[in-house]
Amino acid sequence: MLNQFSRTQLIFGAEGMERLYRARVAVFGIGGVGGYTVEALARSGVGTLDLIDDDRVCLTNVNRQIFATRKTVGQYKVNVAQARILEINPDAVVHTYKTFYSPQTAEQFDFTQYDYVVDAIDTVTGKLALVEQAERAGVPIISSMGAGNKVDPTAFEVADIYETSVCPLARVMRQELRKRGIRRLKVVYSKEPALTPIDDMTISCRAHCICPPGTARKCTQRRQVPGSNAFVPPAVGLILAGEVVKDLTGFQRGE
């Protein structure tokens, strides 16, 4: 019967769509990258989504984040995302957590419930904890490397973390994961060298923070606020979602 996922079913088949419907995917970080991952997973028919992010929409998010508009500024990102998902697919189950994921909050999450985990968070300590927790639970995970200060969305590719180069975040992750005995990690990364942001104090978040009231981690607390745009983070988020969908459905080109 024709339905909103019929065009997707033409690629992944009825069995693939059933796998997506029965899948539970956790997305950690609902920002410029993770927001587009969530959007694509919802439109692909993933049945259950867990959204983890403690942040509120800031005016400076509107340039790149799909859930950020002038109307949603000040609202929790997970709440905005949940409402949008249910507009796309009213049958979806959405769990939201206003939590900043870190080694200290990791035990709040039971990874054995998940069929796939997406890492779209910014901190190295959080990323490492996510990977370790997924590894212990035997759950597939894919991780986003650096997307800030870059302008070429076509430069991103999927690789194992130990096959990456150029990206400073990937280098740190390689070193730390090796220490922890993690042998593999699927990532999305770019070989494009990061740009140096223009030093303009009139548009500096650190000098003129406009984070909404109630924001837990303001721009003034960050060591550096990277430059961003409307076309790189979305590309990374969509690549992440594509890998999740292909892995969950068992898709192989040519079959």
Predicted regions and their residues:
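N-terminal charged helix/coil linker that caps or initiates catalytic domains
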Residues: 1-26
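Glycine-rich phosphate/adenylate-binding loop
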Residues: 2, 112-113, 121, 126, ...
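Conserved N-terminal Rossmann-fold NAD(P)-binding element of oxidoreductases
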Residues: 27-29, 52
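Hydrophobic/small residue at the entry helix of a nucleotide-binding pocket
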Residues: 33-34
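Glycine-rich phosphate-binding loop and adjoining beta1-alpha1-beta2 segment
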Residues: 46, 51-89
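Conserved SAM/SAH-binding loop
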Residues: 98-106
